[in-house]
């Protein structure tokens, strides 16, 4: 029994040492890639188009609301030949955000009652 326990401890120690070595090897390359991706994401996040503003220049540039990303919706105004595109939130997503907000608020009340 002591032999099995000693063998198990030795096996766990070797496994943790080998996994730490592999993480060190991959760590530097992954860290550099992660930093560049974060910088790109921050640069892209600054360029989002607010709700009800023109998004015809880039239809994927709409900002995010609390839970969902707004959608670039294009339409022709009455009596006009020009297409107008604006960032809008679809109604079903608007209702889902309201429901999530109410559920979050109700969860806070329950936590307050029983917490």
UniProtKB/Swiss-Prot annotation:
Keywords, alphabetical: Disulfide bond, Knottin, Secreted, Signal, Toxin
One GO CC annotation: extracellular region
Pfam family name, one: Toxin_35
Positions of the pro-segment in this chain: 21-44
The keyword Calcium appears for this protein: no
Domain notes: The presence of a 'disulfide through disulfide knot' structurally defines this protein as a knottin.
Protein name: U3-lycotoxin-Ls1k
Organism (species): Lycosa singoriensis
């Amino acid at each position: 029994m002591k032999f099995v326990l000693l063998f198990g401890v030795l096996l766990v120690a070797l496994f943790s040492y080998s996994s730490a070595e592999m993480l060190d090897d991959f760590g530097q390359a992954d860290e550099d890639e992660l930093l560049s991706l974060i910088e790109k994401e921050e640069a892209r996040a600054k360029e989002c188009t607010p709700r009800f503003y023109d998004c015809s220049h880039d239809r994927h540039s709409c900002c995010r609301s609390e839970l969902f990303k707004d959608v670039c919706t294009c339409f022709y105004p009455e009596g006009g030949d020009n297409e107008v595109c604006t960032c809008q939130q679809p109604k079903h997503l608007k209702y889902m955000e309201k429901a999530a907000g109410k559920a979050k608020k109700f969860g806070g009340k329950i936590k307050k009652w029983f917490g």
